[in-house]
Regions:
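Interfacial helix-capping/hinge residues at the ends of transmembrane alpha-helices
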Residues: 5-6, 61-65, 76, 88, ...
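Helix-coil boundary and interhelical linker segments in multi-pass alpha-helical membrane proteins
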Residues: 33-45, 91-104, 156-163, 218-224, ...
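Membrane-embedded alpha-helical segments of multi-pass transporters/permeases
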Residues: 29-33, 89, 93, 116, ...
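Single conserved hydrophobic/aromatic residue that forms the stacking wall/gate
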Residues: 1-8, 12
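Hydrophobic/small/kink-forming positions within alpha-helical transmembrane segments
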Residues: 29, 54, 58-59, 82-90, ...
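Membrane-interface interhelical linkers
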Residues: 10-73, 120-141, 173-205, 210, ...
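Juxtamembrane helix-loop boundary signature in multi-pass membrane transporters
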Residues: 86-145, 155, 250-271
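Specific alpha-helical transmembrane segments that line the substrate/conduction pathway
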Residues: 56, 68-116, 167-174, 225-245
């Protein structure tokens, strides 16, 4: 059953996601004219690309939040962040005909293993001994599948139709707003309160979250998905290192070793 505190947390997350979509659209829409416009004259292709992407991203977020509600955060996060890149690599090889070198594939494997190890560092002994079905693991896997699906679709869209990453991101966020609006229906007073009290966090999120994916889309246009997808997970290492040196979190040896494995994988990709 869902955790008792999950209801209030879910409401907050939906409200924050609404502000993120609205704020991200407002921040980045003005950048479109300076970054190549839509990138294509085919308006139908643009609408199809962002329309499908918007639905996929909302579905991904819904599955992820359900996973956080049903299971341990570290389990869901590690499983999703390991499964997503792995499936993206497999599909990119099968559908896009990408052929990474053996060395690069070893690097990809190292990154995925290291990321999963970082995510599982805080799993309790009791959890590991529990033989019952781990819903966190199930939803982590489903989230990984969702990550792979939207990654492959977005790569196909920006490559095939030469769409501008900025315009694509803005279009996707714009289409997410109605979905998130449905999620916060009847709670608009609370949404406004959140906007007043958390505006600094919302502004930062509205700038940085879209920027991170715009950079991913830009990389996908010039590099194989099989290499870009795993490299997205470098942020997990940075957070882990911050936890070791700034927050003095437990099991620093494990965290540093896992981070070193990821770093080694990145080096192999660069060779």
């Amino acid at each position: 059953t869902p955790k008792p505190s999950s209801a209030a947390s879910d409401v907050y997350k939906r409200q924050f996601l609404w502000w993120g979509a609205v704020g991200g659209t407002a921040v980045w829409i003005g950048v479109i004219p300076f970054t190549g416009g839509l990138g294509t004259d085919d308006l139908l292709a643009f609408l199809l690309g962002v329309g499908v992407s918007g639905v996929l991203h909302v579905a991904y977020m819904a599955v992820l939040q359900r996973g956080y509600r049903e299971g341990n955060l570290s389990t869901v996060y590690a499983t999703a962040r390991g499964t997503g890149p792995f499936l993206s690599v497999i599909v990119a090889i099968l559908l896009f005909g990408e052929r990474p070198s053996v060395l690069a594939l070893v690097g990809v494997a190292a990154i995925i293993v290291g990321v999963v190890a970082i995510g599982l560092v805080d799993r309790g002994r009791a959890e590991r001994q529990d033989r019952s079905l781990d819903l966190g693991l199930v939803f982590g896997l489903l989230t990984g599948v969702a990550i792979a699906i939207y990654t492959i679709w977005d790569a196909h869209a920006v490559r095939t139709w030469n769409l501008s990453p900025v315009a694509f991101m803005v279009g996707t966020m714009l289409l997410e707003i109605p979905f998130y609006s449905f999620g916060v229906r009847g709670r608009w007073a609370a949404v406004r309160t959140l906007g007043r009290t958390q505006w600094r966090r919302i502004v930062a999120f509205s700038i940085l979250s879209p920027l991170s994916y715009i950079l991913v889309l830009t990389a996908i246009q010039i590099a194989p998905v099989a290499l870009v997808a795993p490299l997205r997970e470098v942020s997990v290492v940075l957070v882990s290192l911050f936890g070791v040196f700034a927050l003095k979190e437990s099991r620093p040896g494990w965290r540093l070793a896992a981070s070193a494995v990821v770093a080694g994988g990145i080096v192999l990709l660069a060779l």
